[in-house]
Design a protein with these regions (language model features):
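Short amphipathic alpha-helical segments at helix boundaries and their inter-helical linkers
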Residues: 132-133, 137-144
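Flexible coil/turn residues that form the inter-helical turn or adjacent wing/linker of helix-turn-helix
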Residues: 81, 139, 153
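Short, flexible active-site recognition loops that position polar ligands and cofactors
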Residues: 144-152
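Amphipathic terminal alpha-helices
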Residues: 153-169
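Residues that form generic nucleotide/phosphate-binding pockets
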Residues: 113, 149, 163
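Oxidoreductase cofactor-interface core, primarily capturing Rossmann-like NAD(P)-dependent enzymes
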Residues: 2-101, 105, 112-117, 121-123, ...
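Short, amphipathic alpha-helical "lid/cap" segments that border enzyme active or binding sites
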Residues: 54-62, 143, 157-162
Length: 169
């Protein structure tokens, strides 16, 4: 089994990633790829997604678990605005003071790359399907779930990348 850590691997994520690697567990982490190559590889150079900060996800989970009135409801979480992968990398480039580029891969090549990294073929195909969904615009929406359940706005991509910039250096 391979663990996918797509976002920054900051203090907590970095510790989790390192423990998995130390235990010999295959990990595909976005931050190490960016750190090593200054590129992010994917299919979805178009299409936008409102990325969620993991802390917002955790805050919502705590709120839902503590409030039986929210149980059994559908809670779709998003960040506050939609970005494309190239736009997210522009923000990261500004944080790092050097350019991080988006490298477009073909679907077969990306599946093969993920399998080589240790993903089961079915999971690799699922991740590529997710990229297609982004390109098709299926994730181009934002929700108010974080605000509704926590009483505050969701964290922005700029905040997340600023706070985790050292993971990409």
């Amino acid at each position: 089994m391979t663990t996918a850590i797509i976002g920054a691997t900051g203090r907590i994520g970095g510790a989790v990633t390192q423990r998995l690697l130390d235990a010999g567990h295959p990990v595909l982490a976005g931050a190490p790829e960016i750190k090593k190559t200054r590129t992010w590889t994917g299919l979805a150079d178009s299409g936008r997604v409102a990325l969620s900060d993991t802390r917002d996800v955790a805050d919502v989970i705590v709120r839902v678990l503590g409030d039986p009135a929210t149980w059994g409801q559908h809670h779709e979480l998003t960040g506050p605005r939609q970005v494309s992968w190239p736009e997210a990398l522009e923000v990261l480039s500004a944080e790092l003071g050097e350019t991080v580029t988006f490298r477009t891969a073909d679907a077969f090549g990306l599946v093969q790359r993920l399998v080589k990294a240790g993903f089961p073929a079915g999971m690799a195909e699922l991740l590529v399907t997710r990229e297609w969904a982004i390109m098709a615009g299926e994730n181009e929406r934002t929700t108010t779930t974080v605000r509704d359940l926590t009483g505050r706005e969701p964290r922005t991509i700029e905040e997340f990348l600023h706070e985790n910039r050292d993971s990409f250096r």
